[in-house]
Amino acid sequence: GSGPAGISAALYAVRAGVDTTVLTKGPGALDRAEKIENYYGFAQPVSGAELERRSIENARRLGVQFVTAEAVGLTYTDKLTVETVGKDYPADAVILATGASRAVPRIPGLAGLEGHGVSYCAACDAFFYRGKDVAVLGSGEYALHEVQALLPVVRSVTLLTNGAPLAADFPPEVTVYPQAVEVVLGETVVTGVQLSGGVQLPVSGVFVALGVAGSTALARKIGAEVDGNRIVVDARMQTTVSGLYAAGDCTGGLLQVAKAVYEGAQAGTEAAKALRKG
């Protein structure tokens, strides 16, 4: 992430002598702020876009590398590895700073069946649906990543775009339904979905992969503890997974630049300290 938390973390890590790369899909929430006048050091209001531009420029000056890529997954084998569209990035430490997770659409039945057929991680849960029919809710690269994880395991995958246009090239064996999802069916477990127009599809699982993978979605993929849309961290910004840190809006609390910068500084410092210890 290249918002206040991500750039702050990168600044502290690179100045501590750590090779530091920022993976960013592009401007985030800060870029949309028209005027900021409560941030330290500015005599006049500054736009979010300008503050972001200056921060990135400073990070580049200090040696931070920037890669434009959309993170779609996070795994751990010999190293933590961030999966992006087209390439994987192994790292000794990862700091999640991609902002607050997007709200899940208020589709009746969706929230109530989480863990009982509704999932947010194909890599985690595909095994439980082997030989069954499932649906993926989404339309972009993140949804494609989940589809690709499911296809070798399940019997069939149906894509539910919920009215959004397709933003990725999906395999031909995936059936696409563009209609709005009206309700997720099932009393104790998912039994299907109902779309606008009265269409009902029998499925055993619904995998939510809307928009881009937020910090919380990535944390879930590797087993880090989350609390709702918030990643659980300690005072060092360390998650429950060794080597994985989180900072900024994704940890909850005050959604302000100053708080994000502090947490990024803490995460970058602690990650660098841990790497020096080996």
In which residue ranges do the predicted regions lie?
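Glycine/small-residue-rich loop that forms an oxyanion/phosphate-binding "nest" at active or ligand-binding sites
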Residues: L62-G131, L137-S139
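FAD-site-proximal beta/loop scaffold in flavoenzymes
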Residues: S101, R106, G112-F128, L210-K259, ...
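Hydrophobic/aromatic beta-strand patches that form the interior of the parallel beta-sheet core
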Residues: T21-L23, V67, I95, S119, ...
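Short loop/helix-cap segments at secondary-structure boundaries that form the rim of catalytic
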Residues: R32-A33, R106-A111, F127-Y129, L166-E173
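A Rossmann-like FAD-binding core segment of flavoenzymes
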Residues: L30, R53-T77, T81-E83, D88-A91, ...
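Beta1-alpha1 glycine-rich phosphate/pyrophosphate-binding loop at the start
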Residues: S2-R53, N58, K132-D133, G138, ...
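N-terminal-biased segments
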Residues: G1-V22, L96, A100-R106, V193, ...
